[in-house]
Structures are given as C-alpha cells and as structure tokens.
Amino acid sequence: MPSASLLKAAAVNALKMSQVGRGLCLPGMNRYMPVMHGAQGCTSFGLVLLVRDFREAIPLQTTAMNEVSSTLGGMENIAKAVLNIRLRAKRDLIAICSTGLTETKGDDVNAYLRLTAEAPRPGRYLTGLCPHALTTGASQDGWAKALEALAGRWESRGRADARQADNLLAGCHLTPADIEEMRDIVQSFGLEPIVLPDVSSWLDGHLPDNFSPTSMGGTTLAEMRALGASIVCIANRRTEAPPTAQAVQELCGVPYVVFDRLTGLQANDRFLAYLEYVSGQPIPARYRRQRSQLQDAMLGWPLLLRPGVKVAIGAEPEPVAVTLRHGWPRWAAELGGCRDHHDLAGARWRSPQPGWWIGANLEAPGTKGARARACAGSCWLTHSHGGQAAERLHIPFHRAGLPPCSTGLGAGHCLSVGYRGTRGLIFEIGQPVAGRGPCTYPG
C-alpha cells in the first residue's frame, strides 16, 4: 500500500479523452457522421489525435459555436450543420455530440433536434443526441455514451429471421485487428456476427476505390436493425458495452453475456467453450494448435525474467481496473507467478522462485507519485502519450491503451485477443521486461 505522502491531489499534463472515444465509436457505423456541438477547438483536438494515431481520414464535423451563438443558443448552428451534411455528404445517420461548452451553457439539444426534424428536409436520415461533457470522463465513457445513443435509434424490435447470428459489442480498447480476430473466431463456429460498432472495416488500412467524405465501412442500418434477430449478445468490458446489451435484451429479448477480457489462456478457453455451447459446433482444430503454441510461449516466460522485475501500468480507469482485477493477476498466475497482494492502490505478484517479483502500480502516468515509482520499474505499460515521461525517466515502455501509437505505424494492426494475440503480447512485453532484445525508448 503506498504511503500517504505519495498520494497527491494533482494531475500533470491532464488530457481529456471523452470526445476521442465518441469520435472513434460513431464512425464505426456505415454512412454515419458525428457532429461536435461546440467550438471548433473541441473537434480539432480529438480529430488530431485520431488522425495522427491511425493515419486514416476520420469523419468528424462541428457546429462551430462562437461567442454570439454560445450566448444566444446553438439551434441555428445545428440546423445548418445537419442540412449541409445531408446535402454534401448524403449520410443516413447524423449524431449530435454535446461538448463541455454546450453542456455548461445548458443548450436543450433534444428540443433543437425535434424542431430540426419537423422542418422540411431533403431525403431521409436519422439524427440522434450523444450527451456527455468533455470536461468529465475518459474515452471509455464517451464510447459507452455513443453506444447508448445508438441503442435509442432502432426502428425494428422484432426477430427478422431464424439465422444463427450473434451480436458483438466491442469496447474502445479493441483495435481493428482485435475486432477482425473476434469476427473470424465467431464465424469459425458457423455463426454470423454483427459487430457494433465495426471500426475494423474502415480503420484496417485498406485503399478504397473511390473517395468517401465519411467512414469507409462500418455497421449498416440494416445490420443494426437485425440485432434483435440474433440468438445471443456478446459484450466486451463491463462498463462500456453492457448498457447497450441490456437495451437489446429489453427491446428484443436477446440474452447477453459479458467477457471482461479476451487476453490470456483461461479467458480464451471460456470464450471458445461458450461459442461451442451456443453454436453446437466443435472447436476448430486450428485453435487447439494456437492454444498449444501459447502454452509453449508461456513456459518460456519465467525462464527469461530476471530477479527484481517491476512493471508499471498507466491507463484509463476501466482498462486499469479490468487489467488489475481480471487481467494481469490471472495472466501472471498463468505465466508462473502467484498473486501476493492486490488492492485499488496497486498490485503485486510474487514468483514461486525466491528473489524476484512482478508489480503494477495503479496511478495515472501524469502524476508525480507514479513517476517516482516508475523510476524503479523495468517496463512501463501505457498509451503513447506516456512516452514523454518515459523518455525523461529513461524507461522502456510498451504502448497500450488509447491513443495507441502516435509515434509509430500500424496502430490498427496490433493484436492482443485470442490465443494468437496473447502469444504476441507475451513476446512484445517480454522483450523489454526480460532485458533481452530491443529495449525501445521513445523519441
């Protein structure tokens, strides 16, 4: 347990990521356009982060509120933005996302949208509100709010057919490669997955045939309306997807199950066993071989670690909570370590071999206490913005979280789920931790 002197009510280099979560989730719908109802800076900040990380065109618009419109109200700005998007981009869905400016002002955006919907409009499209102040919450909160907003726009609640389909509600921590791997696993059992939102079809780094002013793929309206035709809803992460899964269950009667993680041997064993139970199909042989390869990689992990290895983790609340309570303790036990201590302030696991232990400190990478503890760490697991502090402390770090990789390439192709993803993650983290191989420093 850290001493009271190290717990400081201060934050250094604070970064608000709620708008990034919404900006990443909403374009996962096909022919969809998110609009930030606020100043231009509220939109450009999140847009710069997403474009720099994924090296892709991110569709994101703004109502461009100024001093006058912020004082008198932003209904005219919303009406103009919706009309321009419909005429120029011809989108099927338009999401109005409130920002810290409009939430503080108290704009009745729902009333604005009702009045806008009653006005004559060219064609047919859907509009929805995604309320959440930018001054609160992390990217996981923005992602969850966006999913809840999507849940309120369904028009069909009945079962369309009796096909063997299931719903995959993805979390904000999943990369396009992770979602693609989950889809392949589900399809191998004869099921037809409907991913919501499907960012893998537009952030996977492909070259389109034609220019598109919005996302190049994603979950279609027809697929979203067919969520009620599925036999089960699989949600990932306890705070992001379950509210939407509960809404699907209330509207359509589709049961849901939540998996905290899909990284690790036991977690994937449970996932494949559940798919085997739901589909009635045996587990494909290739996953048995991948499981054997993962076991071989896990056997070599304790032999590479040197005495006194420490790993510091810095991430958002939900990834850290899941990582410490459900991920790293169980994963460390699978890799040959035993959990010795675990609480909200930190976690530590002691190896059966005397003389070394693995620890993880639960503090944001921007706090002074975390920096002081990380000085003794052998590796730092955090998002790409932690590279600045890691460079000053001369500590190798593995990029994990959102934003994923602002200084490198291939952020959307990083795989961490399934047997293959877990095996690759062991190798990526094991290199700097063991001190053998590339110990990459940022900068």
Curated annotation (Swiss-Prot):
Keyword entries, A-Z: Metal-binding, Nitrogen fixation
Keyword Metal-binding recorded: yes
Family annotation (Gene3D superfamilies): 6.10.250.1090, Nitrogenase molybdenum iron protein domain (3.40.50.1980)
Tree of life domain: Bacteria
Biological pathway: Cofactor biosynthesis; Fe-Mo cofactor biosynthesis
Tagged with keyword Nucleotide-binding: no
TM segment ranges: none
Pfam families, per database record: Oxidored_nitro (PF00148)
Gene Ontology terms: biological process: nitrogen fixation
Entry-linked InterPro entries: ChlB/BchB/BchZ (IPR050152), Nase/OxRdtase_comp1 (IPR000510), Nase_comp1_CS (IPR000318)
Binding-site list for [7Fe-Mo-9S-C-homocitryl] cluster: 42
GO molecular function term, any single one: nitrogenase activity
Protein family membership: Belongs to the NifD/NifK/NifE/NifN family.
Record's function text: This protein may play a role in the biosynthesis of the prosthetic group of nitrogenase (FeMo cofactor).
Identification of the protein by name: Nitrogenase iron-molybdenum cofactor biosynthesis protein NifN
Phylogenetic placement of the source organism: Bacteria, Pseudomonadati, Pseudomonadota, Betaproteobacteria, Burkholderiales
